[in-house]
Amino acid sequence: MTPPHSDRPEDTADPKLLEILVCPVTKGPLELDGARRELISRSAKLAYPIRDGIPIMLPEEARKIE
């Protein structure tokens, strides 16, 4: 089994893709948290997971943050 926070290249999203993605809830900017493999929307207070290099931009899949 792979550790939840590995440094495999496939665990991070394509930087070009990250430049154009916005939060689907607020349409605001996202910040990459490479250590957690998440895209953070500060305005929506949500963290979207990146799985196998693919950002999962579904609000129901996002983790709530404070």
UniProtKB/Swiss-Prot annotation:
Xref: InterPro entries: Trm112-like (IPR005651)
Cellular component, GO, one term: cytosol
SUPFAM superfamilies: Trm112p-like
Top-level lineage group: Bacteria
HAMAP family: UPF0434
Family statement drawn from the similarity comment of this UniProt entry: Belongs to the UPF0434 family.
Protein name: UPF0434 protein Nwi_0075
